[in-house]
From Swiss-Prot:
Native organism taxonomy: Bacteria, Pseudomonadati, Pseudomonadota, Alphaproteobacteria, Hyphomicrobiales
E.C. number: 1.5.1.47
Keyword Oxidoreductase attributed: yes
Protein name, entry field: Dihydromethanopterin reductase
An individual GO BP term: tetrahydrofolate biosynthetic process
Pathway as given in its UniProt record: Cofactor biosynthesis; 5,6,7,8-tetrahydromethanopterin biosynthesis
Temperature impact on function: Optimum temperature is 30 degrees Celsius (at pH 5.3).
InterPro entries per UniProt: DHFR-like_dom_sf, DHFR_dom
Subunit text: Homodimer.
GO MF entries: dihydrofolate reductase activity
Record keywords: NADP, Oxidoreductase
Record's keyword annotation contains Phosphoprotein: no
Length: 135
């Protein structure tokens, strides 16, 4: 069985994104910095698959310590996952990607951050049971 996981952070009410970025991007509060550090530590040496916007936000240094694959929601997910036999695969998002890959994810690593501001993208709890609540 392929080891497929999701790693993401959400705000207090499930906020995921705002204007194409993390709503808390650039926040230097130690809890936010710790979450970013943890993301890079957990994915190090593994595969990170994500949509183009998510991959575009990954700093250049991160490409040397993990395999990063830009995927599209229309790609066959089973074919994508088969590219990495024996590897741990993290699905990094965004929403269109999670809508497709939710049914393959065996472990959800979700960090709730102390952000309670605005957002235009939200975490869908239906992903936790294998599918999108809304299409």
């Amino acid at each position: 069985m392929i080891d497929v996981r999701c790693i993401c952070a959400i705000g207090q009410r499930g906020q995921l994104g705002l204007n194409g970025h993390l709503p808390w991007e650039g926040n230097t509060d130690p809890l936010f910095v710790e979450d970013v550090t943890r993301f890079f530590a957990l994915t190090m040496g593994h595969v990170l698959i994500a949509g183009p916007k998510t991959v575009a936000s990954v700093p250049e240094f991160a490409f040397k310590d993990r395999t990063i694959d830009v995927i599209r929601s229309h790609e066959d997910p089973e074919a994508v996952l088969k590219r990495y036999p024996g590897r741990r695969i993290f699905v990094g998002g965004g929403i269109a990607v999670w809508n497709v890959y939710a049914k393959y994810i065996q472990h959800w690593d979700v960090t709730r951050l102390p952000y309670d501001g605005e957002a235009d993208r939200w975490f869908d709890p239906a992903w936790l049971v294998g599918g999108p609540l809304r299409s």
